[in-house]
Amino acid sequence: MTNVTVRAMTRAEFDEWQTEIAEEYATEQIAAGRWRAEGAVERARDENALLLPQGVDTPRMLVLRGIDADGEPVGRAWVGLDHPRGAPDAAFLYDIEVLEARRGSGLGRALLEVVERAALEAGAAALELNVFGKNTAGIGLYESAGYEVTTQQMRKMLRGEPSSGDNEGAAKP
């Protein structure tokens, strides 16, 4: 097993990560048909700001940097110790990511395991997450790590592609 540890992100790492995660999350939401492209990055930033009002110092949030045995960064993770839908004793994994240049070498599993330990040590009895349906690599990782589907959302477009208006999920005629 690849050796990975985690530590709290620095403020500089947090600021860089917030820019990247907002862009990634907006792209995922657009691809899933949940958001329109216009204003999506700003919306993602706003949502993250609500969840992390004190940034890296937000209580009950683990904002972590994964580090390999050589002290080099391998990825990041964000765990909320209070589940967003109130599930008792469950933390929520908002984000986990291995740096692109480091993917494919077992670091994802190693990072996930150390993040699970951090959540357990912080008092969580379970860890839940959301994974987008087209993220087959993530789905495979989570299933092989023992995660089970607890809820599932599905979508079928009835009238073409989502429009660029303001209503979430609306479709063009």
Could you say what each language-model-derived stretch is?
Residues 99-101, 105, 133-134:
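Active-site acidic-Proline motif in GNAT/NAT acetyltransferases
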Residues 105, 121-125:
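Short coil/turn segments at alpha/beta junctions that flank glycine-rich nucleotide-binding fingerprints
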